């Protein structure tokens, strides 16, 4: 295992993962393996070394399999760790393997971890869930996976959501796909729908839900996904009481504003200081914003609505709170371009703010 120290190098990383997996025999990574709770015999003497390994940054072998996009090693690890707390171990930045997969936009990896039982409500150091991070990096397919009810049992890689359908509309029927042709009623558990629902209302340490994040980043497609999944379109953020409509106006995102209004967002909602979305729109140079709001019944602002509040000003394109809700991420070494959604982001030297255009 000394080769793990060289994981920063592509060749050494592949060699370590491949040799470690290959030395365990042809059936080591078979689905439904003995699991971490099995009694360790001579054939499992390697397990404490692999599952107990942690880098100086707090990354486990599972973190490394995700970072290096090593699918065979990932499948092997999940074969033994599905349904265990190992999936939710956090590195020094509070990131689980699921957080990293979302940051990298690796939808197939997100799905494997999700189906294996990874926690979707675990928050990293900035308070972000995996869905928050998917919204920040515009990983739409990752969000599609996370916005589906979790299957009752882990599925084979050939039977995943991504291979079944390319339609990203969340399934709100709340009926998980059948994974056993002959289920045993005595052993059948209730579908675990609650986690994916709770993601929609989860707040990061700035009080932003995934919908707030998507609106601030002017991502109409992500807003549509969250709307279809049942996100609260009128939930205010805690600092000034801005609803998604207020945030869309401040971001001057007309397409997002129109989407929210057509979906039923309340144009009469007020910030804590009394300002309506239309009152905020009249302070912006884009006339389309006010026109859209008036077309959907927004009331004309009162005199006090014209006063500037501590939360906004009329001089910037986006005056959302530009304080970051997370800390900087580790330098992520990626040596494969297999991302299904997007190219992996370059390492951040500073925290990534929710507001893409800070004042």
From Swiss-Prot:
Protein localization: Cytoplasm; Nucleus
Organism: Mus musculus
PANTHER family linked to this entry: NF-KAPPA-B INHIBITOR BETA, PTHR47303
Organism taxonomic ancestry: Eukaryota, Metazoa, Chordata, Craniata, Vertebrata
SUPFAM superfamilies per record: Ankyrin repeat
Family: Belongs to the NF-kappa-B inhibitor family.
Keywords, comma-separated and alphabetical: ANK repeat, Cytoplasm, Nucleus, Phosphoprotein, Repeat
Phosphoserine carried by residues: 19, 23, 313, 318
Tissues showing expression: Highly expressed in testis followed by spleen.
This protein's name: NF-kappa-B inhibitor beta
Keyword set includes Thylakoid: no
Residue windows of the ANK repeats: 57-86, 93-122, 126-155, 206-235, 240-269, 273-302
Any one GO CC term of the record: nucleus
Function comment: Inhibits NF-kappa-B by complexing with and trapping it in the cytoplasm. However, the unphosphorylated form resynthesized after cell stimulation is able to bind NF-kappa-B allowing its transport to the nucleus and protecting it to further NFKBIA-dependent inactivation. Association with inhibitor kappa B-interacting NKIRAS1 and NKIRAS2 prevent its phosphorylation rendering it more resistant to degradation, explaining its slower degradation.
Gene Ontology process terms (BP): cellular response to lipopolysaccharide; inflammatory response; regulation of canonical NF-kappaB signal transduction
